[in-house]
């Protein structure tokens, strides 16, 4: 399960700056849910090789009378569901009553907390952070988030060890997600050698065999009241299986195993399968953290949309997180029954307009309440999963690359054409294709999109994102001095003597 890091503290202590540092972007609004989480930000980060969900909880205006009264409900939820809390304080402003109140709240919750003293640039950090030890939360980590100072040390000495500890405790850690930023290849590997490429294909095939006959995890996600629980119950009701919880898997998400046509599935219900009478607030039905974790843990995601409301900004935010996580996708438009033909046409037109960037995903129009169209979902789920784990070989991908270049050659850069040499598989779930060549960094984005679409069409990948990575060919002479042969040295010596004589 992906660990969750919550950034808490008073306003203007640098939480958003640290958020951007950890997520390595200046606008990392992976999932922003207006009206539900207000100014809370959710982002995905890869820290020291470990995946995290990072939350900026916004400023907490606590007072010495009681910080709990001033904490927003979503801040409380974020702290409750976080694995690690980074408590930011302002080293320049010193210890304030609000800091003491927040620290007291965190101690009461017995949450793993790290005090981070920000804005230590240009001051004596040791003397300024000393007073924060009286908070009783252990070591204080000094940083200057705006300049990036101390952030690497915070990652290496605090977050990375915590991630390793959490991963060691995880019960279900069979995710097979490839990280393109850490996709490294041996520079000595010869892709022109058939024996070497055969070994690579064999190794990747072994990885793929682990996904065969696997229990497919399906996450049903969406905004509140779009019919997620109804769809879950309809799927289970059709199959007449006994629903039972699997304790210890994830916080409030319920993992429900089922079987259909000999294939094992696990439905991840982010609604918690609670009785309707016990749910008083809409916000109780929808936890951002539970949804993001369910997406990370799933093989196929069913993004459920209310046909009567259309595609909202919240739907697009969830969609962005699904694509960034590299998950297979099926779009489910619920509550399709009872709509007039004009409204149905308008809904389809809006879907085509707002979701044109994910034309690879199947769209199903269903009624979870009445069951119409629900049974057809599994064919698309199977198709998306099989495409995500599709077998690819180096020779196959290189042949497709050559056909793509024959149809449309790479552009000229400074009078020289970008040369693409070969392609090989880089992983599955999602399919990753690595292309090697020269002057790769000068290849325009338009041509990269062309190659991505060409590979998708040639491989017939539907329902799954595809990642095409580009790597510059290694220069065998890079970093080496030009070493002359003995005959060249003698020739150079004679030439130097001739030059000296001519100058006399």
From Swiss-Prot:
Limits of the KH-like domain: 390-474
Q: Which GO terms describe its biological process?
A: ribosome biogenesis
- Composition bias of kind Acidic residues appears in 172-190
**Carries keyword GTP-binding?**
yes
Record's keyword terms, sorted: GTP-binding, Nucleotide-binding, Repeat, Ribosome biogenesis
Report if keyword Cytoplasm is assigned.
no
Question: Which InterPro entries does the record cross-reference, listed alphabetically?
Answer: AAA+_ATPase (IPR003593), G_ENGA (IPR031166), GTP-bd (IPR006073), GTPase_Der (IPR016484), KH_dom-like (IPR032859), KH_dom-like_a/b (IPR015946), P-loop_NTPase (IPR027417), Small_GTP-bd (IPR005225)
- Tell me which domain of life the UniProt entry assigns to the organism this sequence originates from: Bacteria
Q: Where is the EngA-type G domain?
A: 3-166, 216-389
Positions of GTP 2 binding: 222-229, 269-273, 334-337
- Give the matching Pfam families: KH_dom-like (PF14714), MMR_HSR1 (PF01926)
Region entry Disordered, spans? 171-190
Any one Gene Ontology molecular-function term assigned to this protein's record: GTP binding
Q: Which residues bind GTP 1?
A: 9-16, 56-60, 118-121
The family classification in the record reads:
Belongs to the TRAFAC class TrmE-Era-EngA-EngB-Septin-like GTPase superfamily. EngA (Der) GTPase family.
Classification via PANTHER family: GTPASE DER
- Oligomeric state and partners? Associates with the 50S ribosomal subunit.
Its annotated function is as follows: GTPase that plays an essential role in the late steps of ribosome biogenesis.
What's this protein's name?
GTPase Der
Protein species of origin? Glaesserella parasuis serovar 5 (strain SH0165) (Haemophilus parasuis)
